[in-house]
Amino acid sequence: MTEFDLNQYMDRVGRQARAASRAIARASTADKNRALLTIAAAIRRDADQLKAVNARDVERARANGQDAAFVDRLTLSDKAIATMAAGLEQIAALPDPIGEISNMKFRPTGIQVGQMRVPLGVIGIIYESRPNVTIDAAALCLKSGNATILRGGSEAIESNTALAALVAEGLSAAGLPPEAVQVIETTDRAAVGRLITMTEFVDVIVPRGGKSLIARLMEEARVPMIKHLDGICHVYIDAEADLDKAVRVCDNAKTQRYAPCNTMETLLVSQDIAAAALPPLCRIYQQKGVELRVCPATRATLEAAGFSGLVDASEEDWRLEYLAPILAIKTVVGLDQAISHINEYGSHHTDSIITENYSAGMRFIREVDSASVMINASTRFADGFEYGLGAEIGISNDKLHARGPVGLEGLTSLKYVVFGHGEVRT
């Protein structure tokens, strides 16, 4: 596809999305739910065909030398297909935020002022190898009254196109424009460059991908972004922590799963409790095969307790998202240093304190500058489902617009509504 043809194609997609966004914005909850449930039924009906199409993507990925983890993310198994269908049904069951009016106030002039929740408009979503994101993103955008343009990874092009056809079927069955959800059908990388600069058609970009993708988009995008960067999550064991809670929470925060962005990557421990807290916890980590990268004070504490096989932490380790069985551990003087370390080295994602001291806990959640801050709970709870939001499009580290898990409300905005009785301003 020439540059001229690509620009024409992307402009057509953008115009269609903008036109469809107006219809989706005024669609009834019943029609949106009907579309979601029809898509779910179509996915179950065509499961075998979806697996056959996906198998071609998987075969191509293997031939291109992609590793096992990549192939696993790409594969549409029976479980993955069932999960997609169930997810659509769950989103259909969620309350519709669109049109909700809140914060109504009577003014001395006689008018009433409130805020109404409305769609953002057209959302561009850029993602990599997971074809299930096609359905998750389409469903969240549809329920929140937005049109969406989806740009998945080239490795999943056949799977994404097949899923998009089922989405179009569901939209049409509910009397909604099929152009409300469009998958970019070219694998040309220049399509991403055009999508992120189409300010006339696209209201916001939501990228889901690795560091290099996000970095490129931050440099080149003209459309505003809701982005998800690293998940460098911390747990701080305070001097007044309950040791049983500390061991249980810190074990779960690191070892329940290694790949999610809400997994703990750095453990901070008060020097006043390090000798009691570190040995039982690190014994569990070593039994589970977790590599421990430690500061000098932590090394001294653990070696005195008979530990070996420790790795010296470098300055870089405090800034790394491992997504692997590796944990950085630092012994700190106390709460002041813990908060300072998190705000300097963290990614503003999710951080937790283990303490029985109310004042310490409240100070931690006030002063740590992260999207989610916790007291006596695992960072693994930083999730839209666990927060009662239902499905999520991602977890935003940003401070503007959506922050933390981005569910239906995160894909909307508020406009002011005023009710009067003929009042005029004097």
UniProtKB/Swiss-Prot annotation:
Thylakoid keyword on record: no
Family matches, as InterPro entries: Ald_DH/histidinol_DH, Ald_DH_C, Ald_DH_N, Aldehyde_DH_dom, G-glutamylP_reductase_CS, Glu-5-SA_DH, GPR_dom
Domain of life: Bacteria
GO molecular function annotations of the record: glutamate-5-semialdehyde dehydrogenase activity; NADP binding
Ranges in coiled-coil conformation: none
EC number: 1.2.1.41
Subcellular location: Cytoplasm
Catalytic activity entry: L-glutamate 5-semialdehyde + phosphate + NADP(+) = L-glutamyl 5-phosphate + NADPH + H(+)
Pathway(s) it belongs to: Amino-acid biosynthesis; L-proline biosynthesis; L-glutamate 5-semialdehyde from L-glutamate: step 2/2
Family: Belongs to the gamma-glutamyl phosphate reductase family.
Name assigned to this protein: Gamma-glutamyl phosphate reductase
Gene (UniProt): proA
